[in-house]
Curated annotation (Swiss-Prot):
Domain of life, source organism: Viruses
Pfam families reported for this sequence: Ank_3, ASFV_360
ANK repeats: 59-88
InterPro entries (alphabetical): Ankyrin_rpt, ASFV_MGF360
Keyword Iron-sulfur in annotation: no
Name of protein: Protein MGF 360-11L
Organism annotation: African swine fever virus (isolate Pig/Kenya/KEN-50/1950)
Record's keyword terms, sorted: ANK repeat, Host-virus interaction, Inhibition of host innate immune response by virus, Inhibition of host IRF7 by virus, Inhibition of host RLR pathway by virus, Inhibition of host TBK1 by virus, Inhibition of host TLR pathway by virus, Viral immunoevasion
Length: 353
């Protein structure tokens, strides 16, 4: 739809840095939301809105969804005139009155499955605290997602969280779609180190404390791991923790932390072999893993002959500098930031001969 002169004027005003003593002008113009001014800006050809409830900035289409959920018709009209896709609003329009307004402004009568999936993943793309919290609020328990077969979205989420979702049997047996979505947002927050979002989920979903611990292990987030294990006292079996840490390759910080806490380093090497993680396997050897014959047998069973050949050598030794019991995440990260396995170098030198 073509923007009115009034909405264009508001857009220009929303781009300005308005002094606090002139905030009454913004209130009169409808540029006020959650006790704060609405600011408009563009970044990399995308339109964003800032307000007190999302100070980091949220894409205009996503903000439209929040306005629709709140039945804020003035802001719906304004955001659409500024260039938002009204179909995003329809996804979160729960009242008939708001749905009718969306259709008056050009929304489709009904969004098909592919379009809803596109909206879902486009909205999730911006990995900030404000956006992930807002995504959770917009999509969780959203009756309009019933238009999408749960299996479609489940399969997409399972693919995005492949490896992590496969071990949820260690946690709980709540496989509801709503619980899966919450786990999805929580995992993104831990993966990207979004502290505000992590705190939000931690306070709101106490039954998912161990899920956060699993995410910290899986995504090699040693800061979150230390906070949960040492400060918040969230507990799991230490060898189960090590198992999760070994699923993704080069998870040195999480593996080291579990090792210092008493995990079996030979079992960690076996998990690394099962997952074809050469980097993790050699790091376990650096930490003292020495069950080479058992590891070689496992590698042959997995038809991973490169690992089997590597474990045939007899020249590996623990790296003494790694054996000091460091649990401070800052020191662990500093120690392992540019770490290269000494024993992997031994193997590579042998291969070059």
């Amino acid at each position: 739809m073509l923007p009115s002169l009034q909405s264009l004027s508001k857009k220009v005003l929303a781009k300005q840095c308005i002094p606090v003593d002139q905030y009454h002008i913004l209130k009169c113009c409808g540029l006020w939301w959650y006790d704060g001014p609405i600011t408009f800006y563009t970044y990399r050809n995308k339109m964003f809105i800032k307000s007190t409830c999302f100070s980091e900035g949220i894409e205009l289409n996503t903000v439209l969804m929040k306005a629709a959920k709140e039945n804020n018709h003035d802001l719906i009209r304004l955001f659409v005139e500024w260039g938002a896709d009204i179909n995003y609003g329809l996804v979160c329009a729960h009242s008939e009155h708001t749905r009718n307004l969306c259709r008056e402004l050009g929304a489709k009568d009904r969004l098909d499955r592919e379009y809803i999936l596109k909206i879902f993943f486009d909205t999730t793309r911006n990995k900030t605290d404000s956006n992930i919290i807002l995504c959770h609020e917009m999509f969780s328990n959203n009756p309009n997602l019933k238009h999408v077969d749960d299996l479609d979205l489940r399969e997409e989420i399972m693919w995005e969280l492949r490896g992590l979702m496969e071990i949820t049997y260690m946690l709980d047996h709540d496989n509801s779609f709503s619980n899966m979505l919450t786990k999805y947002w929580y995992a993104i927050a831990v993966d990207y180190g979004l502290k505000k979002a992590i705190h939000y989920f931690y306070q709101k979903y106490t039954h998912l404390h161990r899920w956060r611990l699993m995410c910290a292990l899986f995504y090699n987030n040693v800061f979150d791991l230390h906070e949960l294990y040492e400060i918040e006292r969230v507990r799991m079996d230490i060898d189960e923790m090590m198992h999760i840490a070994c699923i993704q390759d080069y998870s040195y910080s999480a593996i080291y932390y579990c090792f210092i806490m008493g995990a079996n380093i030979n079992q960690a090497m076996f998990v690394s072999i099962q997952n074809y993680n050469l980097g993790n396997m050699f790091f376990c050897i650096d930490l003292g893993a020495n069950a080479f014959e058992e590891g070689k047998t496992l590698a042959i069973q997995k038809e991973n002959y490169l690992i089997a050949d590597a474990l045939s050598l007899k020249h590996y030794n623990p790296v003494i500098s790694l054996l000091s019991a460091v649990t401070d995440p800052e020191k662990i990260n500093s120690m392992l930031k540019n770490y290269h396995s000494k024993n992997m170098v031994v193997f590579l030198d042998y291969e070059r001969r």
